[in-house]
Amino acid sequence: MSFNFTWPEFSAEFYEYAVQTLTTALNRGQKPKSIVGDIHVKGLHMGRVPPELEILEIGDLSRERFRGIFRFVYAGDAHLEFSTGVQANPLARGSEDHGIFSGPMTSRGMLFAASPLTVPMRVCLSDFKLRAIVVLVVSRTKGITLVFKNDPLESVKVSSTFDSVGVIQRYLQEEIEGQLREMFRADLPSIIHRLSQDWLRTESKEKVVPTPSAQPAKPAMPPVPSDVWPSHHTADVPLSVLALEEAAPSAYASHLTKLDTASQSSQGLKDLVQPAGSHPAGARTFHTTSRVRVPSSLESNAPPTPIALSSPGGLDVAGHLAELLRANHTLSPYTPHPRLVALRTMPAHRPRSSRVHARQKRAFHLS
């Protein structure tokens, strides 16, 4: 069984993200003492030569998950270029026996400068030779997991600003190879895993089609005129000057006459607005115990003078009706028929005969 792998031309977005991820990975953790600046990746190219893969084992093969063990061999033309700052003096290790400046001057503790000097350095890595056993797990939900079972780095070519100084060149070669081995062990698998998760997340967003909302639109509320009950007018007036429809102030006396007549009847003020027997189904009955305010449409320059009524039963008609019609909703803009508002109150107290009073107090005793 054989497979053909295509090594594509990677996009600019891939290179930009890979450069940012590599910069973060190279600056993570403890760097060598001679490197005093941050490491910035300046160039990255994956090359045109693909790696070689030999299938050793297929452990899981399905539409959602794949797991396999491969022998990975790479000897391509990929390269990586980065820059940083190094300390020119001392460029030495912790031990005097393995110092990079081995000679009589360093053995006596003599240095080339009296104070440390930071020098910019540019490094290019190329001619990678890798060989390893790779465990590859591909999941459509969790991404790609890549693990090297052994050290993959065989050799790498390090070119730097200090290639003319052989001692520094050998020191950089050893340090960079050590950092690359650590990167292949820990950093590269995490970078590939994050790249695969971002790719899967982008692919899932493209497949999701937004569905329109099925909730019905709420009907708009009718506008409330602001001039019906002015908020700045808080003076309460007796009901003797309140009309349920727009009328001239001269009509107040006729309304008061109706109030006085209705207060003496047995039905109370039930038929004040509309005669008995003609109430429609939409008529409303309000029970309230306070006073109301006059709408702005009934206000005039000179407020009318309240007219006091006297009833034989001791009922204060004006005060009692003022307690009946509290609430702005009595004549609010939402009242469907303001002229058909029915009012109910208790009839005036009438003295009852002694016979009726005695009949109500009659007690029955069972022997």
Swiss-Prot record:
Gene Ontology CC terms, in alphabetical order: ERMES complex
Keyword 4Fe-4S attached: no
Endpoints of the signal sequence: none
Keyword Iron: no
Key words, A-Z: Lipid transport, Lipid-binding, Membrane, Mitochondrion, Mitochondrion outer membrane, Transmembrane, Transmembrane beta strand, Transport
GO MF annotation terms: lipid binding
Subunit structure: Component of the ER-mitochondria encounter structure (ERMES) or MDM complex, composed of MMM1, MDM10, MDM12 and MDM34.
HAMAP family with a match to the protein in the record: Mdm34
PANTHER family named among the record's database cross-references: MITOCHONDRIAL DISTRIBUTION AND MORPHOLOGY PROTEIN 34
Job description of the protein: Component of the ERMES/MDM complex, which serves as a molecular tether to connect the endoplasmic reticulum (ER) and mitochondria. Components of this complex are involved in the control of mitochondrial shape and protein biogenesis, and function in nonvesicular lipid trafficking between the ER and mitochondria. MDM34 is required for the interaction of the ER-resident membrane protein MMM1 and the outer mitochondrial membrane-resident beta-barrel protein MDM10.
Protein name (database record): Mitochondrial distribution and morphology protein 34
Gene name linked to the record: MDM34
